[in-house]
Amino acid sequence: RMPSGPGHYGASAETPGPRPPLCPASSCCLPTEAMGPRALLVLLMATAWHAQGVPVIQPSGPELVVEPGTTVTLRCVGNGSVEWDGPISPHWNLDLDPPSSILTTNNATFQNTGTYHCTEPGNPRGGNATIHLYVKDPARPWKVLAQEVTVLEGQDALLPCLLTDPALEAGVSLVRVRGRPVLRQTNYSFSPWHGFTIHKAKFIENHVYQCSARVDGRTVTSMGIWLKVQKDISGPATLTLEPAELVRIQGEAAQIVCSASNIDVNFDVSLRHGDTKLTISQQSDFHDNRYQKVLTLNLDHVSFQDAGNYSCTATNAWGNHSASMVFRVVESAYSNLTSEQSLLQEVTVGEKVDLQVKVEAYPGLESFNWTYLGPFSDYQDKLDFVTIKDTYRYTSTLSLPRLKRSESGRYSFLARNAGGQNALTFELTLRYPPEVRVTMTLINGSDTLLCEASGYPQPSVTWVQCRSHTDRCDESAGLVLEDSHSEVLSQVPFYEVIVHSLLAIGTLEHNRTYECRAFNSVGNSSQTFWPISIGAHTPLPDELLFTPVLLTCMSIMALLLLLLLLLLYKYKQKPKYQVRWKIIESYEGNSYTFIDPTQLPYNEKWEFPRNNLQFGKTLGTGAFGKVVEATAFGLGKEDAVLKVAVKMLKSTAHADEKEALMSELKIMSHLGQHENIVNLLGACTHGGPVLVITEYCCYGDLLNFLRRQAEAMLGPSLSVGQDPEAGAGYKNIHLEKKYVRRDSGFSSQGVDTYVEMRPVSTSSSNDSFSEEDLGKEDGRPLELRDLLHFSSQVAQGMAFLASKNCIHRDVAARNVLLTSGRVAKIGDFGLARDIMNDSNYIVKGNARLPVKWMAPESIFDCVYTVQSDVWSYGILLWEIFSLGLNPYPGILVNSKFYKLVKDGYQMAQPAFAPKNIYSIMQACWALEPTRRPTFQQICSLLQKQAQEDRRVPNYTNLPSSSSSRLLRPWQRTPPVAR
């Protein structure tokens, strides 16, 4: 039966389904003395239903809602006696009138809220009737049935807070005490009849919870309900015995600790020495919701009687859990060195061997090392070994990879502790195939061939004679000579065994070849000897006599070789397509280790069918490939039609250039998406050339966009010279056009008047543009806020790259694209750039580099870091606020330029740059990389400048006359070289 007040509560019940419409209190809660014809009709209907054998509750309906203070009567009618179950006492009066039972309360309160069941115990058919009563009290929206709930971990936990008003259900929530939210992983549901159910409660969800509801715009919480989630006690107590092994010298102190813990306090723990149970005082504690019992044996002066087996046992209702250890008592310190390998090792040259020593010592080793003892004094390499310690045992392994002859010899492991020093020595002998050398000598006036064979193991020697001069005697045609004499000349440990074999042949005959063959278990070798004339006692000639034909052939071959080397040099000098972006793997100071992009994974989710691409015009072309506008059908969504840009290589691309494009694809997929990066949309890597599908940027690159705007605002005579073909495409080529300029940016015919700037209205701009809006947006005059937005967006994109440990290495306006809404996106468009004819890329060594955008450490030391990208970003800022001028105007890239950069020269403030923006440029150009700001700091500075810009009128530059000059809304300062 349901309790009538706070108390202990158990696990949850099933929550009911959707409730039917509520029974109005006015029609169901009439006092018994006021029953009229309508009430009698209800009784007749109940009697008809009662005839079917199921108890009936009046009023009918699953729920009843009443106001506080109302008189409520609940009648249950059955075939025989019936019983009520629910929160009855002491809030109800019970009136038994078989076959019915009546519950009445004359002053309903929120305590009457609950579910009432009526059953008929004597009815064999069983059955019951249920009604849920709400007494809606705005001051008490919750009725808590229990203030403590205990469940086992993994069970559902019901927190029994009943809602007194069903109209409040939409605004209920579960919180922890003092309004703290529940844990993110807590999974719970709510039933107004039963309360909140936490599903599969976890041990970490032990908390005091409150039920919360919104009542008249304020939050009202219930009293706290303490949820206790207990670990399931499914076995014996956990047990530890420390140490697992113990060694002591006689007279030293020792300690053995036996510890057991469990959720339930009802368990025992004991410690035994052999069969003897030790009497030790027990320490108890409660930690991390577990009871812990500890037995500690302290021995101040150990003796041999204390040695032996110790066992710790924990016992509870689930059984026993035991652990044991061995305690050894020794007379003095010791160290024992052993090896499971033979101390005499033979290994073939070029192979690897591991020498391993096992040490058991007490006290622990003070020092240990491997030493090479010779005999080859020239072998002084540092030995590479690993030593693993386990209590009183050590395992030391010496690794010798790719053995050379000079590495044979004695290797000794030396270990020292308080007991003294011990050593274990291996003798390593290397096997290698024989080497043969044949010479001619005279012995007792007779021609004799001497064959010297050296190797290990000892080589065997045989002689073979064959007709004619040949490099090797055929086995079938040769004659094996048996009349040879062999003897061991030298046999020293760790050195080769040298064998001499003499072949007495009398007088040498012309047109004969003699071959000495030597072999052992590792391999074989041979050398031939033939005379060039009768009686000539010379060894085999090194080469044949030169002839004019041979000299001619060798001259031609040498000439061809030189030509081949020249072509190879020219090929190496030719620039190749490379990915400028680098991803840092690790760094130490200015020493960076970069990830090999070829080793990055490629996710097949980026794969896109190539027949779903419809190509359009070429956006940009270069020495290595091109970027083409295309329409992608089904990219992202099945029915989507999207304009994209597709990168591809030329058909003549080399394998390394194809690999570079694939690396670029992998880097883009590795970096992920960002609003200010030209994002990867897909790729085609199968069934044809590699295609990289990226976002299409309708305004092309930022450099040409700025130059178009400058010409529109200032006129051709005042603006930057520009490629006449430059439109809204990816025009990253032919940027070497000459244009009239000064240090400040733009030059006219020497007139000193300025173009007046006037405020323009500010209106909200839509971020999405249709095709017909692009021309109108492109024609909108530039404002200061546009330049600030470009700067901020590029900085945000670079901050994103820096957060991904990515270095761009070519930050410039030509590598920034503009899309709808004038959003700037960073990319790398070296594929579609002819760097051979691009004056921005200067030959330095065997590479072409954008030196005017490069930091000093990149120019002089080839060091590329995030800080060097910050320097390049400062140059890009100068490009933006000069409306597309080339950096360092009027300065050629030569030794003078390099000296200026090294000495800290800084360009003057560009014409359209506020003082704060120029200060950012100067900070980016600090000679010391660590003094340059980070991209996050640059973003903050630009946002602050943008906020200041919103507080002053915006200006647009307008040409007033052909004799006008530029005017800015901030103070003009003369160029300063720093």
From Swiss-Prot:
Q: What class of enzyme is it?
A: transferase
Q: Which GO terms describe its biological process?
A: cell surface receptor protein tyrosine kinase signaling pathway; positive regulation of cell migration; regulation of MAPK cascade
The miscellaneous annotation reads: This protein is synthesized as a Gag-Fms polyprotein.
Q: Where is the Protein kinase domain?
A: 613-942
Q: How does it sit in the membrane?
A: Single-pass type I membrane protein
Regions of this protein lying in the Extracellular compartment:
1-543
Question: What are the alphabetically sorted keywords of the record?
Answer: ATP-binding, Disulfide bond, Glycoprotein, Immunoglobulin domain, Kinase, Membrane, Nucleotide-binding, Oncogene, Phosphoprotein, Receptor, Repeat, Transferase, Transmembrane, Transmembrane helix, Tyrosine-protein kinase
Q: Does the keyword ATP-binding apply?
A: yes
Question: What cystine linkages occur within this chain?
Answer: C76-C118, C161-C211, C258-C312, C451-C516
Catalytic activity entry: L-tyrosyl-[protein] + ATP = O-phospho-L-tyrosyl-[protein] + ADP + H(+)
Entry's Gene Ontology molecular function annotations: ATP binding; cytokine binding; growth factor binding; macrophage colony-stimulating factor receptor activity
Q: Which residues lie on this side of the membrane: Cytoplasmic?
A: 569-978
Q: Which residues are glycosylated?
A: N79, N107, N128, N187, N309, N320, N336, N369, N444, N511, N524
Q: What is this protein called?
A: Tyrosine-protein kinase transforming protein fms
Active-site residues, record numbering mapped to chain = D810 (proton acceptor)
Pfam families in UniProt: ig, Ig_PDGFR_d4, PK_Tyr_Ser-Thr
Q: Which residues form the Ig-like C2-type domain?
A: 55-134, 141-231, 236-331, 333-431, 434-533
